[in-house]
């Protein structure tokens, strides 16, 4: 049983799924490994009493027997996945606000100051960092990063999309998607996670913009008018996304043409509709599953 996490609808933290169970955390930052029978294999907390009171929220990534952890109170550390024991622990200057990507002997994360940081997975030493333009307010959504070949591509709080060489940290290309005025407005700016088919990168925001950009050059393929900060799903030649007011959009991947729009909140009364927002969605061969801020799922 997990201790309660506040604002669960606003969280974007995922457990690590293993062949024989999963790993997650509670509100005090305790990491817990469960087996497939829901029994605790181990549980360990690597925080001091003052740190526990801050209710750290953890990001996980795994390589072999190593679990890499970053959090929103500026710690990052490595844990043995079999025992839960600490391999090493370090502190960053600022809290982290992204997931973690691992590439060979390095891992990457972005902090609240829009700085991409590259660390050595074996001892936590910093290999390099790349600062992008900062803002005066705290971002309201987590930053996203993906790795394609030997290039890491990431977003920041002002909507810049930046591609860097994994080994050197040098910028390959950068695409600003917002005007300079966004620097003062990031408290309500939200951007989706980046997704890619290997040739293009797709993402959207709550400023009514859905982008397709070229992986190699960062040039814009097309932009469409869709207001969404949910992670889009690419399947075949189609992109699926759900707007913040509950409309499913099906988009042709190469040209950006909208193939279909469906109102997923059609059965909600107008008053109720104003009070709910989509949280996330997934699709299979025949169904779409949409979770909402009211705790219900639409299929």
PLM regions and their residue ranges:
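Extracytoplasmic beta-rich repeat domains
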Residues: 1-19, 40-64, 85-104, 126-149, ...
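Structural signature of WD-repeat beta-propellers
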Residues: 19, 26-27, 35, 71-72, ...
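Short loop/turn segments that connect beta-strands within beta-propeller blades
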Residues: 35-39, 80-84, 120-124, 166-169, ...
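Beta-propeller domains
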Residues: 157-158, 168, 196-221, 228-229
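C-terminal closing repeat unit and adjoining cap/tail of repeat-based domains
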Residues: 217, 255, 285-287, 292-299
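Redox- and metal-dependent alpha/beta enzyme cores, enriched for Fe-S-associated oxidoreductases
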Residues: 244-250
């Amino acid at each position: 049983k997990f201790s309660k996490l506040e604002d669960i609808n606003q969280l974007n933290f995922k457990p690590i799924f293993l062949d024989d169970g999963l790993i997650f955390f509670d509100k005090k930052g305790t990491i817990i490994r469960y087996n497939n029978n829901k029994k605790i294999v181990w549980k360990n907390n690597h925080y001091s009493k003052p740190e526990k009171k801050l209710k750290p929220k953890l990001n996980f990534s795994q390589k072999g027997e190593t679990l890499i952890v970053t959090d929103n109170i500026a710690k990052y550390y490595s844990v043995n996945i079999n025992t839960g024991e600490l391999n090493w622990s370090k502190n960053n200057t600022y809290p982290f606000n992204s997931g973690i990507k691992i590439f060979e002997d390095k891992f990457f994360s972005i902090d609240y100051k829009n700085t991409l940081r590259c660390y050595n997975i074996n001892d936590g030493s910093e290999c390099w960092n790349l600062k992008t333009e900062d803002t005066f307010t705290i971002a309201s959504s987590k930053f996203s990063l993906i790795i394609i070949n030997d290039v890491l591509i990431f977003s920041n709080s002002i909507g810049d999309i930046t591609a860097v060489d994994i080994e050197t940290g040098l910028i390959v290309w950068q695409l600003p998607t917002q005007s300079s005025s966004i620097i003062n407005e990031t408290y309500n700016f939200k951007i989706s996670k980046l997704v890619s088919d290997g040739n293009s990168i797709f993402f959207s925001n709550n400023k009514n913009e859905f982008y397709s950009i070229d992986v190699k050059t960062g040039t814009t393929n097309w932009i469409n008018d869709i207001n969404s900060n949910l992670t889009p799903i690419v399947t075949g030649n189609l992109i699926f996304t759900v707007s913040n007011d509950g409309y499913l959009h099906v988009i042709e991947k190469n040209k950006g043409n909208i193939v279909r729009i469906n109102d997923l909140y059609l059965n909600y009364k107008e008053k109720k509709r104003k009070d709910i927002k989509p949280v996330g969605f997934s699709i299979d061969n025949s169904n779409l599953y949409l979770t909402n801020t009211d705790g219900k799922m639409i299929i």
